[in-house]
Amino acid sequence: MAQQPLLSLPEFQSVSTGTLVVKEPLNFWGGARVKPRDTKNSEPVYEPATGRVLCDMIPCGEEEVDQAIKSAHSAYLKWSQLSGMERSRIMLEAARIIRERRNAIAKAEVANNGKSITEAEVDIDVAWQCIEYYAGIAPTLSGQHIQLPGGSFAYTRREPLGVCVGIGAWNYPFQIAAWKSAPALACGNAMVFKPSPMTPVTAVMLAEIYKEAGVPDGLFNVVQGGAETGSLLCHHPMVAKVSFTGSVPTGKKVMEMAAKSVKQVTLELGGKSPLIIFKDCELENAIKGALMANFLTQGEVCCNGTRVFVQREIMPKFLEEVVKRTKAISVGDPLCEGTRMGALISKPHMEKVLGFIKQAKEQGGKVLCGGERFVPNDPKLKDGYFVSPCVLDNCRDDMTCVKEEIFGPVMSVLPFDTEEEVLQRANNTTFGLASGVFTRDIARAHRVAANLQAGTCYINNYNVGPVEVPFGGYKMSGFGRENGTVTIEYYSQLKTVVVEMGDVESLF
């Protein structure tokens, strides 16, 4: 009897906060969900908004990882032989299905991740747009012709890598799975994807959608697990590439493991990004930009501009307005349309964020608003992982809250006087994922962008990420890129073919 996709099961038809319980197996390879072999290492997965158990995450062992990778390799042998146009048609169908089921996927994402439904729906839109974008690129993949003397010539072929591994993060579970799989599949690869153990659900929905759209069974597989499962994936001899999104310490381990068999690696790691607001800015836009740079997804965004440098002359007005609007942010049930901030991913993470705020106060910082555990009025949310959005003043560059990634709804505001000074301070970090500048001076805007040591610089906006635009970091924020046409280079390899049209000239 054929399996019902997760999205067609009754429990996913009318998701509301505190109601969803997932009992289906969440591994997927060979075109179907696969029951785990061993449940002894099962870990509970919690619904962030309520603190109740949503499902169990049962990690894959060595035999299961091997099965998933071999299934992917078999599918790769078929998929890579299709034309780009044939691959494109199937990917466009997957994008259409996601678009059609946007709301149901978004609700499942909210239950597992805790972000507001408003944001989750945008995430799902970005996912189908990404797949649609790379579906458009698939038929255009081509090489180059090089004319050589005597009528000889050479040409290049852009070829797939084989089986790629994607390791996702818990802040954008479905979107990251799409970001990694879409360019991989467009190039003719297969992918085995490991979601975060805290958000195991929606990547399986993507796998089922790809199957429904017509990809060969095994082309996009999902294995559940934590560090041990990730290690098995990185060490497997049939894996050609690993794309990882997550923390710097784990990224270093991924790179080390991949190096043993010289696998290609893309790393999208942490950040402590600067947002520089000059006194000549359009202040209203700068305030909105600062809020967008700090409070999306409860502050759990790697590229957030959490070090907000404000030119001293406008600091009082900026703080007054930012605090007023931060206090007005609606925190609560993430499935309610009016909610603008949901729950943090887990209780330990919530406690870590609150610990950063406590330490900031001990180091001289001043909490202008928020920074406390928030308990909504709704009784079912009393055990949720909510934190009121926080603005910190009196911050210094040497404070922990300014140097380390908090990954929560905490904005650290710092004054500055000159462009030269703020650039030096902004670049004084081991991270280099993103940056931003607000100014009306077009020359200054481009000068500052050129001098900021980061993979992305936003001018007069922040946290805008169209799928057409490459995204990735400098320094310890990683390397490689996601999105944009350049990502094709990270999921393919170039073969040079040299053709002699005359006789061989030999020295021997």
Curated annotation (Swiss-Prot):
Family annotation (Pfam families): Aldedh
Family of the protein in this entry: Belongs to the aldehyde dehydrogenase family.
Reaction it catalyzes: 4-(trimethylamino)butanal + NAD(+) + H2O = 4-(trimethylamino)butanoate + NADH + 2 H(+); an aldehyde + NAD(+) + H2O = a carboxylate + NADH + 2 H(+)
Active site positions: 268, 302
Enzyme class at the top of the EC tree: oxidoreductase
Localization, UniProt: Cytoplasm, Cytosol
Lineage: Eukaryota, Metazoa, Chordata, Craniata, Vertebrata
EC number: 1.2.1.47, 1.2.1.3
SUPFAM superfamilies found in the cross-reference section: ALDH-like
Domain of life: Eukaryota
InterPro entries linked: Ald_DH/histidinol_DH, Ald_DH_C, Ald_DH_CS_CYS, Ald_DH_CS_GLU, Ald_DH_N, Aldehyde_DH_dom
Classification via PANTHER family: ALDEHYDE DEHYDROGENASE-RELATED (PTHR11699)
Residues noted as binding NAD(+) in the record, renumbered to the chain: 194, 246-250, 405
Function, as annotated: Converts gamma-trimethylaminobutyraldehyde into gamma-butyrobetaine with high efficiency (in vitro). Can catalyze the irreversible oxidation of a broad range of aldehydes to the corresponding acids in an NAD-dependent reaction, but with low efficiency.
A Gene Ontology molecular function term of the record: aminobutyraldehyde dehydrogenase (NAD+) activity
Keyword Hydrolase: no
CC annotations in GO: cytosol
UniProt-listed GO biological process terms: aldehyde metabolic process; carnitine biosynthetic process; protein homotetramerization
Subunit (UniProt): Homotetramer.
Protein name, UniProt field: 4-trimethylaminobutyraldehyde dehydrogenase A
Pathway where this protein functions: Amine and polyamine biosynthesis; carnitine biosynthesis
